[in-house]
């Protein structure tokens, strides 16, 4: 593509993302499906704004590459070792069973045994990008279904390598000694990457970090990710696997969090571009010509993979509440199918219309997953919330609660227990289905659902409740719920959990007066006890704690971020901190002159 055409395409991608994704979110069909529909609209079979789909699809695979790097950063070799049984046990079983059934189905049509074999293996692969994105949206990455799903995806990434090597053999291409020599060189280069990454990358980042220039650190992070991907592609291996390994090698380094922050914005945009390009690749001409055959193929693909995954979840004793999510989120075809099928077509293993038919089937199966996950959410909500009610009724009981608590993790549990101990009527909403099932077994009335959905809040009684307490892990979810409540339930008193000062500032800017920084109070309490152990009288330590809390809150409000630049903001922070330290010292000096009337035992 020429530079002007590339710039035009970039602007077009940003425009459709900005327009389509919010509309999709408002319609409740999810961001991923919004990207796919946007891709269909601007692609060669839609409005025709973009023609060179293959080049864009190849470039957009970098979204998956960045995603796998960040996932690698979140693991370490020890944690990966603990997943070995699920990777090579459940992962291998999923690929083997799915490939056997789907390949057999292809063989019963007009596919040869060679094309049926490679077709079955390709269809057995799931979309790493889509599955991981949906897992994060649904909060599955924190429970058993998410961990097992990740293990299956990782095995699929590994399985692509021998599958690609199998294609020339199926095509009848004879190898020679030179082929084995090249394979040996690739293995040696791969081992060299592992050793170099282990012993050279960390000192390199230490040298770069010492410069203190953030832009150079970001450039180095991009160089590491893109360099690893390019190196693995040159070896004929998976780019995503290479960056995943690079992430694991740095998972225990002191630069892990900085790397994650540097890469995150690129990952999000490129993943969106990947889904748009998948939508553009959908051949509507083939779909129109063979619509019945393709629809049956999509149905069989999703049903077979879903059934295999559900069976594996059951024999691995996964909680009943998580099996459907596990089966649904991996039920689609994946991006590696494009690679496998294109390679097979180049060796003439796939012939005629077999390639476009398979590609359209995979693309449509990817479009079914967001909708399927919504159906599963509804099924789980009805199963684990209200029992034996007509379908038209809401799936959360409106008990006319005084308080709605969003999130039932450790933070939300403490709040809920305190409220229930004081006979308050509460409704608890939780998105993690395993937590809902577990807490209901202990007698807690917890409902499954995503509180960022307006109808769920309305069903839970938000229009009648006096307060809502938001304890979400994700700050973006907290802010979305805050905006929903302010817009649709203005009489609802909002109380929220803030993970730190940044989230606290965001809440203050939206007008939320009551919030708690999750580590602030416990840190103050431990600080007070430390003062007592150092010899300060318990009364003075308590007063010091109270003064510090009040003054820190004052500083938090005074230092609200303004559009004055980083240097001005830093200057304001330093000046305010000095001023508040002076005030604190004067107030504590007055406190020391007051008589002490109680000691530590009076608490």
UniProtKB/Swiss-Prot annotation:
GO biological process entries: proton transmembrane transport
Gene Ontology cellular-component terms listed: plasma membrane
UniProtKB keywords: Antiport, Cell inner membrane, Cell membrane, Ion transport, Membrane, Potassium, Potassium transport, Transmembrane, Transmembrane helix, Transport
Transmembrane segments: 5-25, 29-49, 53-73, 87-107, 115-135, 152-172, 180-202, 207-227, 230-250, 268-288, 291-311, 326-346, 356-376
Organism: Pectobacterium atrosepticum (strain SCRI 1043 / ATCC BAA-672)
Protein name as annotated: Glutathione-regulated potassium-efflux system protein KefB
Quaternary assembly: Interacts with the regulatory subunit KefG.
Matches recorded under Gene3D superfamilies: 1.20.1530.20, NAD(P)-binding Rossmann-like Domain
Cell cycle found in the keyword field: no
Compartment(s) of residence: Cell inner membrane
């Amino acid at each position: 593509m020429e530079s002007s055409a590339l710039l035009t395409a970039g602007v077009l991608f940003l425009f459709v993302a900005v327009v389509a994704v919010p509309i999709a979110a408002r319609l409740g069909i999810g961001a991923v499906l919004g990207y796919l529909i946007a891709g269909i609209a601007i692609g060669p079979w839609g409005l025709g704004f973009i023609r060179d789909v293959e080049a864009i699809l190849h470039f957009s695979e970098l979204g998956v590459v960045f995603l796998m790097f960040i996932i690698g950063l979140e693991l370490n070799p020890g944690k990966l070792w603990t997943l070995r049984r699920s990777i090579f046990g459940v992962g291998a079983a999923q690929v083997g069973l799915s490939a056997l059934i789907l390949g057999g189905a292809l063989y019963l049509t007009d596919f040869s045994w060679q094309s049926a074999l490679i077709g079955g293996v390709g269809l057995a692969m799931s979309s790493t990008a889509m599955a991981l994105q949906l897992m994060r949206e649904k909060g599955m990455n924190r429970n058993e279904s998410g961990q097992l799903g990740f293990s299956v995806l990782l095995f699929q990434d590994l399985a692509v390598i021998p599958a690609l090597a199998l294609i020339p053999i199926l095509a009848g291409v004879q190898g020679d000694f030179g082929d084995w020599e090249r394979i040996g060189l690739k293995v040696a280069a791969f081992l060299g990457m592992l050793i170099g990454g282990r012993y050279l990358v960390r000192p390199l980042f230490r040298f770069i970090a010492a410069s203190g220039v953030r832009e150079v650190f970001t450039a180095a992070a991009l160089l590491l990710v893109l360099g690893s991907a390019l190196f693995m592609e040159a070896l004929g291996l998976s780019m995503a696997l290479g960056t995943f390994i690079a992430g694991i090698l740095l998972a225990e380094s002191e630069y892990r969090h900085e790397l994650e922050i540097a890469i995150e914005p690129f990952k999000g945009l490129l993943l969106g571009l990947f889904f748009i390009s998948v939508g553009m690749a959908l051949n509507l001409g083939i779909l129109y010509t063979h619509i019945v055959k393709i629809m049956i193929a999509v149905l069989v693909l999703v049903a077979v993979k879903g059934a295999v995954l559900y069976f594996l979840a059951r024999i691995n004793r996964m909680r009943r509440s998580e099996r459907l999510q596990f089966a649904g989120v991996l039920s689609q075809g994946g991006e590696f199918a494009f690679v496998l099928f294109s390679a097979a077509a180049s060796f003439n293993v796939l012939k005629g219309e077999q390639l476009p038919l398979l590609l359209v089937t995979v693309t449509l199966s990817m479009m079914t997953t967001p909708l399927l996950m919504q159906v599963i959410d509804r099924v789980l909500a009805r199963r684990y919330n209200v029992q034996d009610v007509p379908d038209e009724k809401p799936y959360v009981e409106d008990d006319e609660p005084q308080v709605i608590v969003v999130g039932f993790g450790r933070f939300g549990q403490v709040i809920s227990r305190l409220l229930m101990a004081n006979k308050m009527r509460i409704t608890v909403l939780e998105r993690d289905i395993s937590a809902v099932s577990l807490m209901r077994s202990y007698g807690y009335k917890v409902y499954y659902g995503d509180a960022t959905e307006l109808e769920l809040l309305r069903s839970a009684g938000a229009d009648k409740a006096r307060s809502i307490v938001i304890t979400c892990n994700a700050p973006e979810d907290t802010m979305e719920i805050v905006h929903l409540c302010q817009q649709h339930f203005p009489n609802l008193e909002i109380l929220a959990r803030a993970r730190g000062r940044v989230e606290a500032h965001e809440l203050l800017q939206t007008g939320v007066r009551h919030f708690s920084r999750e580590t602030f109070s416990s840190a103050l309490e431990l600080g007070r006890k430390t003062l007592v152990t150092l010899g300060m009288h318990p009364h003075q330590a308590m007063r010091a704690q109270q003064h510090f809390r009040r003054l820190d809150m004052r500083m938090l409000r005074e230092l609200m971020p303004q559009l004055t630049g980083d240097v001005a903001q830093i200057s304001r922070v330093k000046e305010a901190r000095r001023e508040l330290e002076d005030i604190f010292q004067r107030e504590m000096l007055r406190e020391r002159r007051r008589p002490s009337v109680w000691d530590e035992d009076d608490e």
